[in-house]
From Swiss-Prot:
Disulfide bridge partners, by residue number: none
PANTHER family: COILED-COIL DOMAIN-CONTAINING PROTEIN 178
Swiss-Prot/TrEMBL keywords: Coiled coil
Name assigned to this protein: Coiled-coil domain-containing protein 178
Length: 867
């Protein structure tokens, strides 16, 4: 059944696809299908009639052929066989085999029964056996023929029952066969109608093919004519390309033949090349060893350079700290100057107050004449004190100017040192970049050398050139390393000088700071004196205010004047704060105010005669105040000593912390270096892992490839063994001929080897001489390059030194001019102030003479009145 189905499906597909076939081809296909159906029916019939005799099978086959012979003659598609009819009637093919097996069982039992009753029933056995055989194998005989043997069946009931069952099964099988035959006839009718329909379709398709298919083909041909032309052109192009490739193939074959000849020649002369390669490999190994030594030296130099840079950075940070401290001190000095200004303002206010008190005291001048002389003496002493104070102020100003000038000079020196450091740093960076470039060039050369080692069979001369270049570069690097070591020594010396200058600057700073502290102590003592006098004068004024209420109105007016003057002074203070750099104007104002104070003191000397009565009380109070001030001075000295001890302890702590920080920085650098080493080791391990992975993949691929090659070789081995057996016979015949040719060729090869050895020796000698001359030339060239670079660097250094010298000259000229300008301004201001002081002194002397004359007149008048 499977075979018939496949045949039918294949035939239908062929008919559907091959619609445009001719009628003869259709007839041939029909005949093939008919033969296939006949073969399928024969197979099914042979299966159904399994176990039957040859005569019955032949008769059955003839009867079936008579029924289906007319049907199978015109069938195009495969029609159902016996099995197909059984499948339609739901009776499987093994039912017939089952019936045959039952009949065989019955026959065996009958034979056993006959053997038992041979002696007594010979005649009955003959008749029964013949009848049983007829009943078994004649399927179409009626049932009435069994009656003559009823008497014999009564004697064997078992046999009778078995015969009845067998007959009932045979009748049932015959009925099923009849139904199967009717179903098969209906299926035949359906298949015939299907055949007719298919024939009609085939005829209609053939008519369509004859009528419309040529037009459709022509249209398609016209539609795709351009494509066909393009395809033809492409085919021609491909043919031309094929010819071109064939030509290239022939050329490549010729070139391959030449290369093969060269390879054979190189294989013959391989030992010489191997020896040469071994020598070059040894040279390369020595070169790599030297290169590693140079790299170690380079790393050490880099580490030392990093340490020097760190030391420079530390020095720069220290210098910045020193500068910040100096700036803080300057800021504190400015604050002290502002405090002095405030005190001057307070003194001015006191001066105004004293002037008001002098006006009030003028009323009592006539009564107290004797006390005036003592007041004059006190005024003289106060003048002397004022003169000493003014001198002290001038000294302080000079010291402050000197300190500012020194500070500026130190700042300039610091800036110069920083500029020198950055210039040196730039040169070091340039040199480091040059070294890095050279290192990159060395790495590139090494990679090129490795690639050239792989290609030694092709580029032997190039390898020799590159080895010489590497030797030349090595000498260059050695000279550069020497130069770097010299530069390192110079930098170390320069750093030592910088450290010395920094130490000197620190000592100067501490000395100046100590001097400023002493000056501050002196200023504090002067302030205390002024405060004592202020308290004394306040007490006097309070007594005078209590003595006379009349003076209050005048005091209110004076206070209003003071408020106005204070506002004006506040404005002046704002102006002074805006122009702190211009110190000349406040100095002039201070000198004017000092002159005013002196003139007022002279006026006070006239007015202080009334205060002589309270002199004793004041002296006692002054003594008490002096004692208190002495006690306070002792306390302040103790406090100053404690602060100095604390300051020294703080400085010691700072130095200890600095040393600790240096130690920690060193440890941090060591840890960073260890981290870098670990990272480099990690990178190297990663690289080795990747290399091992790649090697593992390649080895696995090679193993698989080797396995496939081994299998292929094992298959070829069998073929080769057969070929070897055949070729051995040929080899024996050809061996004699080849032995003769071998002797001739050996003689030729010996001669050629002698010639090749001679040529190789000559080539080696020439190469040695060439390499020697080349090394000499490169050494001379390297020396010239180093000399040229050194001369160029010296020229550049000379030019830079000249420029620096000219710039320094200009700078110092400008500094001298600036200092001269300041000195000239200061001298002019001092001369003006001296002239003013002299004028004031003359006026004061005149006033004193007038006052003395006035007092003399007063004394003369009183005496006359008394007389």
């Amino acid at each position: 059944m499977t075979e018939n189905k496949t045949v039918s499906s294949s035939s239908t597909r062929d008919d559907q696809t091959n619609i445009g076939l001719t009628c003869q081809e259709v007839k041939a296909l029909r005949e093939k299908a008919w033969s296939r159906t006949n073969e399928g029916n024969a197979m099914s019939q042979s299966l159904v009639l399994y176990g039957a005799s040859k005569e019955n099978s032949e008769g059955f086959h003839e009867s079936k052929m008579t029924n289906t012979e007319g049907v199978n003659k015109g069938i195009y598609f495969s029609y159902p066989c016996r099995r197909h009819s059984c499948a339609v009637v739901n009776i499987p093919a093994p039912c017939v085999n089952k019936m045959i097996s039952h009949i065989q069982d019955v026959e065996s039992k009958i034979q056993e029964h006959l053997k038992r009753f041979e002696t007594s029933f010979e005649e009955w056995s003959r008749t029964s056996s013949t009848k049983d055989l007829k009943e078994d194998w004649s399927v179409t005989t009626p049932v009435k023929e069994v009656k003559p043997g009823e008497k014999r069946d009564e004697k064997c009931p078992e046999l009778k029952q078995e015969m009845e069952t067998l007959l009932s099964e045979a009748i049932r099988l015959i009925k099923s066969l009849e139904t199967d035959r009717a179903d098969a006839e209906e299926a035949l009718k359906q298949q015939r109608s299907r055949k007719n329909m298919i024939n009609m379709k085939i005829d209609s398709w053939s008519v369509w093919k004859l009528q419309e298919l040529p037009l459709a083909v022509q249209k398609e041909h016209e539609a795709y004519l351009s494509d066909v032309i393009e395809l033809q052109w492409h085919l021609e192009d491909k043919a031309n390309q094929l010819q071109h490739f064939e030509k290239q193939k022939t050329e490549l074959e010729e070139a391959n033949a030449k290369i093969q000849a060269d390879i054979d020649y190189m294989n013959e002369h391989g030992p010489l090349l191997d020896s040469k390669q071994n020598q070059e490999l040894q040279d390369l190994k020595n070169h790599y060893k030297k290169k590693m030594e140079v790299m170690d030296l380079h790393r050490k130099v880099n580490e030392e350079l990093e340490e020097a840079l760190e030391a420079c950075e530390n020095a720069r940070l220290k210098a910045q700290q020193i500068k910040e401290e100096i700036d803080k001190d300057i800021y504190q000095d400015e604050k002290t100057i502002e405090a002095y200004k405030r005190e001057i303002y307070q003194l001015n206010s006191l001066f105004d107050h004293y002037s008001s008190s002098v006006i009030n005291v003028n009323t009592n001048i006539e009564e107290k004449e004797e006390e005036v002389t003592e007041a004059i003496r006190e005024t003289k002493s106060s003048k002397n004190e004022l003169h000493s104070l003014s001198k002290m102020l001038e000294d302080l100003r000079r010291v402050y100017d000197q300190l500012t000038w020194k500070q500026k000079s130190h700042e300039n020196q610091y800036l110069e040192a920083v500029n020198d450091f950055y210039a040196a740093k730039k040169t070091w960076d340039i040199e480091l970049s040059d070294v890095a470039k050279d290192f990159s060039a060395i790495s590139l050369a090494c990679t090129k050398l490795t690639e050239d080692n792989k290609k030694l069979e092709i580029d032997i001369n190039k390898i020799t050139v590159k080895t010489n270049e590497s030797i030349r570069k090595k000498s260059k690097y050695e000279s550069e390393i020497k130069y770097l070591t010299i530069m390192k020594l110079k930098n170390d010396k320069h750093l030592k000088n910088i450290y010395k200058e920094a130490y000197r600057i620190g000592t100067l700073f501490h000395l100046t700071k100590h001097k400023t502290d002493e000056m501050e102590d002196k200023i504090a003592e002067v302030r205390r004196k002024f405060k004592g006098r202020e308290e004394f004068l306040k007490k006097l004024t309070q007594g005078e205010v209590a003595a006379g209420m009349v003076l209050q109105k005048k005091l209110y007016s004076i206070y209003e004047v003071q408020a106005l003057e204070r506002k004006e002074l506040i404005k002046n203070r704002a102006i002074c704060a805006m122009s702190l750099a211009e110190l000349q104007e406040p100095l002039l104002q201070l000198e004017d105010e000092a002159e005013r104070i002196r003139s007022l003191d002279k006026e006070h000397s006239v007015m202080l005669n009334n205060i002589i009565d309270q002199k004793d009380l004041i002296r006692r109070k002054v003594g008490k105040v002096k004692k208190k001030l002495r006690k306070k001075g002792k306390k302040t000295l103790d406090a100053l000593i404690e602060t100095e001890s604390k300051r020294s302890a703080i400085f010691k702590d700072l130095e200890a912390t600095k040393s600790k920080t240096m130690i920690f920085y060193a440890k941090i650098n060591e840890l960073n270096e260890e981290l870098k080493a670990k990272e480099e080791e990690k990178k190297s391990f990663d690289q080795t892992l990747e290399i091992l992975k790649n090697k593992f993949i390649t080895m696995r691929f090679k193993r698989e490839h080797a396995q496939t090659v081994f299998d292929h070789y094992m298959q070829e081995k069998k073929d080769c063994e057969e070929r070897i057996f055949e070729e051995d016979q040929r080899f024996r015949v050809l061996l004699a001929v080849r032995q003769k040719t071998l002797q001739d060729t050996q003689k030729i090869i010996a001669d050629s080897l002698e010639e090749n050895l001679r040529l190789a020796q000559e080539y080696q000698q020439l190469q040695i001489t060439f390499l020697k001359e080349k090394d000499n030339y490169f050494n001379i060239y390297d020396k010239q390059l180093s000399l040229d670079t050194s001369i160029r660097d010296k020229k550049q250094l000379c030019q830079l030194q000249r420029r620096m010298h000219t710039l320094w000259q200009e700078h110092f000229k400008l500094v001298v001019l600036f200092s001269q300008m300041r000195l000239a301004n200061f001298q002019t201001d001092s001369q003006e102030s001296i002239q003013k002081i002299l004028a004031v002194q003359e006026e004061s002397s005149n006033l004193m003479q007038h006052i003395l004359g006035f007092f003399q007149t007063l004394t003369d008048g009183t005496c006359e009145n008394d007389g």
